Amino acid sequence: MKFNLWRQYGALNSSPVFDAFHAGANALGHDVVVNGDNGIDVIWSVLWNGRMSPNRIIWEKNVSQSKPTIVLEVGGIKRGTTWKVGLNGINRTAYFGEQDNDRTRADSLGLVCKPWRSNGDFILICGQHDKSLQWQDMPSMSNWFMQTYREIRKHTDRPIVFRPHPRCRLPHIELGLKHVYRQEP
């Protein structure tokens, strides 16, 4: 199999992840090229903004040709240590392989799922970048945040902590809102 890495359209923190993918594919006997014109394209994220915006052209070409795309992204479990790789997307729309995995990997990372809780010191709202494919068909992030805030306030006065996406910060959106505090990512 042949993989085309589109490194120049990756985020500034993407180099080690591209390097690891490249080394892993080579170790498994696959060919890897940079900016190739055949094989399976490997892009960074589905955020069509800044350095990563040219990935959209690659993505849309592959979708129109029913060609797979591998998407790399920083990890959500241990940021800077773990990373994600998905086929034809990342997060909700991607294929990540087998679904019936045992706990071996989670245990090696020291991960324990905590039960859902309906109480606590605050409610956490995590933002997304509204130029991301992951946010497709959603309102603007600022509109979504305000709708979510109003809905929460119908049910509770507990403090709300807003953690914005690092590249879609919505500066000062919390100002003037009752018990809303910002937590920078």
Language model: regions and residue ranges:
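Nucleotide-activated sugar donor-binding and catalytic core shared by glycosyltransferases
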Residues: 25, 35-38, 111-143, 170-180
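A short, gly/pro- and small-residue-rich
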Residues: 49-77, 143-147
